[in-house]
Amino acid sequence: AKSREVTIYRDTWGVPHIFGKTDPDAAFGLAYAHSEDDFSTIQDVIIMVKQKSGLFKGKDGAVTDFLMEWLRIYESVDKFYHSHLSPDVKLLMEGYCQGINLFAHENNDEIKLNVFPVEPRDIVMGFVFRTPMFFGLDRELESLFNLTEKPEIQSKSKKENSPTPIGSNGFAVSPKRSENGETMLVINSHQPWDGPTSWYEAHVHSEE
């Protein structure tokens, strides 16, 4: 594997600050730091895209494997991978995968299922599979299955299916009201605290 020039610092709160020589180096560092902090969730996603959920979670996991096959995720990614992704994006994903694979190699005792090494196409398949769920495909499919656990995507509130209009929340703070004299726009992104759709805080720096 290609060597990477990257340094990872942790601040007082444990947030990683990643300094890479190139963009792929920084992506490598981001993946390694993320693996240090939440390797369990990262593995859950990898198990999903490798269509091994049935082996790991039994019946409910097998439903996710079926959906991956039914939606032809692998075929779609295989068909468009080279034509729809730029060389720069592929290099970023290669660096990211190397970071995960290195952490997995160094921490064999934490591996749940033998799904390594991770490859760039695995990352793409994860996005291709999960993105339609954010637009409501999971709600359309939910009635087809009697699951104790929804397929890797956190089920949304039943209220979201209500015909009654439901708004989000956000507010602005004027310079006169803010402590630093700056205008602020505060929103709630509706992200869960944990799981595959939770956010991860990191500061990434590249010399490119």
Language model features with spans:
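Substrate-recognition/specificity elements adjacent to catalytic centers across diverse enzyme folds
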Residues: K2-T197, H205-E207
